[in-house]
């Protein structure tokens, strides 16, 4: 079972009204789970609160997991970042449809608890060049 101690966050401020809510939930959760560190894409600097760290996109390639908070476009952007690094991606739907997302902002704390407990499954996806 894979352990997630470094989790990257990908999202776009102008694309999702629920992104700030999701980041607040993550910050609250992270404050009570110090063994898990969160690193947000530097474009989220104004929204990400401590203990979430802000880093450049290149730093996300060293994460154990990427949370893509937004819609399908955000998941695809996270896939581009993860390409060649074998990093799993969890899509968190903060939009209307979210075909590629497995979770919703409303249940984010439970999702993080499940990840920490190892209560998850993965699916391999193909990317066409």
Please identify what each model-predicted range represents.
Residues 1-69, 74-84:
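N-terminal glycine-/serine-/threonine-rich phosphate-binding loop
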Residues 86-103:
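Short, acidic/small-residue loops that bind anionic groups at enzyme active sites
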């Amino acid at each position: 079972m894979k352990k997630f101690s470094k989790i990257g966050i990908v999202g776009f401020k102008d694309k999702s009204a629920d992104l700030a809510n999701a980041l607040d939930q993550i910050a609250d959760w992270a404050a009570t789970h110090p063994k898990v560190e969160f690193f947000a894409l530097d474009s989220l600097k104004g929204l990400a609160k401590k203990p979430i760290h802000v880093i450049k996109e290149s730093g996300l390639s060293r994460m154990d997991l990427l949370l893509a908070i937004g819609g399908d476009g955000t998941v695809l952007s996270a896939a581009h970042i993860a390409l060649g690094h074998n990093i799993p991606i969890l899509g968190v739907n903060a939009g209307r449809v979210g075909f590629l997302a497995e979770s919703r902002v409303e249940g984010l704390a439970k999702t993080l608890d499940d990840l920490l407990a190892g209560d998850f499954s993965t699916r391999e996806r193909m990317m066409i060049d």
